[in-house]
Amino acid sequence: IYDHGGTKAMIDALASPHEVSGAAHLPAAVAGLSSVDYIASGGCAVTAIRVEGPEPSVAHRCEALRALLAPLGDTEELHSKNSQTLWREIRDVIYFSEDQERHIWRLSVPPKEGSRVALQILEGQPGEALYDWGGGLIWLALGAAPDACADVVRQCVAAVGGHAMLVRAPASVRERVSVFEPQVGPLGDITSRIKEGFDPNGVLNPGRMHEEH
């Protein structure tokens, strides 16, 4: 499944009555990094849908989901240890941990816009994406750049009402690029006033979760 198809699969599964507890999409290059052989050896993108609960209920819901998603691609079930390993890898974003040269962004966007936003960003620079939360959370690993591609990332994310946070980059990049989504105008003023109200001396987590004004 390509990224757009993966987004549709996640949205359809989450919108179904089958109590899906997790939905993630691994493009082919990312899936190939998994330690789960069945995932890594396929040579294709993988959309993972998690179902939990009593065994009879899980079996019934899996069957229904496979029928629902069959038009989008082949479906297989992943059980016990392999399933746990895959979801742990996704949670920990383990696929992007090896190459320390790449810059890591965490994007929050409307799920239906996830693949479009990521592909727009990746059109102009090398990198990989990992989609979680049904496409609403995107982890981007981008090639090293002096500004971590911040303008492109934030423009694409802002266009759909999302926000972006730079999670990993060298100190030299962090010195010139805001780690958190810049808060300008009234929103920035409100944030500053609230913080000053309960922390007038600025001793509680300075610079955490937003840039100082």
PLM feature segments, named:
Residues 1-98:
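C-terminal substrate-binding/cap subdomain adjacent to the FAD-binding core in PCMH-type
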Residues 72-213:
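Conserved glycine-rich FAD pyrophosphate-binding loop
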